[in-house]
């Protein structure tokens, strides 16, 4: 955001400060000035002169000798400029003066000093200047000739400062405006801050433009089909338009802000945009079919040619301005070539609207077009500002004689923004700032920026253009800004301290990290987007939900074009990279999100789930990985109820070495050996093992409320159980029987032997468990142990298990 000091003084006429004073004070009150440029920094001793007489140079065909009246005397200047004639008034740099650079437009640091000298034997006591030599350009001064000396208008006063006459005795400030201060994206907002900073009167323009006795609604009809994307649309009509140059003062204001003057109509819309921070657009009403404006979403693949002559392709997320037949503009971004203003325009339709900032930002990015207007709309403008801006534009049209304003306005208002109200709490404000200000002093500071006090409700009322005022802390900041941050006394911090505590989900994540790192795993991180080709690499079935990846609209490339639905690709890629680097024993883990759409194309936000993923190869096997998972479940209070189901059906895992981890009937994760074909596809030449635990599912069952039992007072009784077990029976099934049938007196059990050999019949294996029985309140009797063992044996028999003799 740039503004010139002269433009600010139009609204703060009593402002009298140097550029450095302005910079320091404004920065201290929160409107940070990044830097400034004095337009006349390298200009000196330049006055308006009038050419009284021109003679040919006796020794040079391309040079002429001019006698120039500079007010106090006449000086002789030799020049080669082809465009001067007797009577012209020109900028003259006198002997010892300085210009900013050469006629090629390149500036010289510190300027170029001009001295009296001779050209082909003829004395020259100065130099007449082109606009480029004065440090500016023809874009900023369109009346300047393409080649040659700048010619002043006839009413220029001979002898006066040419720098002042050209408006170069000015300073342009560059600001760093934060996104919450939308009001400061206009010169009026900056001027309001300057007036408050220097305690001067703020004099905004008095906007009043009723127009003639006609009605704008008789000229145009406005329909807004999507009120959420267009909270307000204002339209006014100006007829009998006369296109011509804008006045010099307006051109100078625009030039200082880096905007090239074009004509009175275009300059007025740009001027109001810079003044109010409200983008505007003008349409030739005669090109608007049906005299109707329709604000609607574009159609998918709709083509549209913008003012810059580029054809652009729209989708249904882009908001368009249309007439009765066609699109005439992209809302909030740029108008169309088919409705552009020409010198033959007779009737103009002015538009001042408020569009949804998020939609404008995404649309601008989607079609690859960003403009000054879209940059302002992105911040979220005040709908109440649109009417004042369009009235100001019409007022300027009347004042400059550029047309006849039609009475009334077509105003489609879908949102009336109410002023924000914040409770006034002087004690809280003093506590936050460490000050001892009275309520009256606070209210005086707040009044500087138009924050008023409602006595009846004891509230601070913020105008609608101050979208950043919502809480007491915001009010305290306003007080601090104008009291002076440098005046706030040094105090020790005070307040109520509370014990910090991690959210439950973060505690689970911390446990996952601790367990993984304790077991020798190193943390890795992979991209959240990947190539759709990995679905085939993982051997996913055609109807697998993991193939339903969300396509990214602006991917880094094909390899990063969909959001990941599984973390396996990233883990296996990392294992493969380590294997290719000949790292022999690798253990990695990752805590990362996967993105599962409810349906495609997206109609709502996808299901975003965090997965705890483990991967390893080298010195480890399936049971090592299972042990890490059990350790995790132990720490989160779930181990005793986690079952392992080998029928998980994962096509990317070895069919005989995989299992779902199930808690209370719900799958919380899976583990297994990577399928050899998948490992080969990734270039992993060793057996690899992975485990994936869904953290969000774990959150449903996890608990850190651990229960502790006292030290046993009574003796334990041990029984060994040796069995012949069918190979189809899983250890988990046996342990389930032991837990359910052993009752409360079964304290623990331990598998201590597995045997397969000639002494065991085919299809069976021998397994031996050690069972520990104990009662916490008394010494166990043999009958109690016998009864428990009988229940256990009956349960094992149901599984086809026989006791060994």
Short names for language-model regions:
Residues 5, 24, 64, 198, ...:
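Glycine/proline-enriched, intrinsically flexible loops and inter-domain linkers
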Residues 40-44, 211-212, 497-498, 502, ...:
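Beta-rich nucleic-acid/ligand-interaction surfaces
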Residues 48-78, 158, 263, 269-338:
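Conserved mixed alpha/beta core segments that line enzyme active sites in large multi-domain catalysts
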Residues 198-224, 401-429, 436:
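Terminal amphipathic helices with adjacent charged low-complexity linkers/tails
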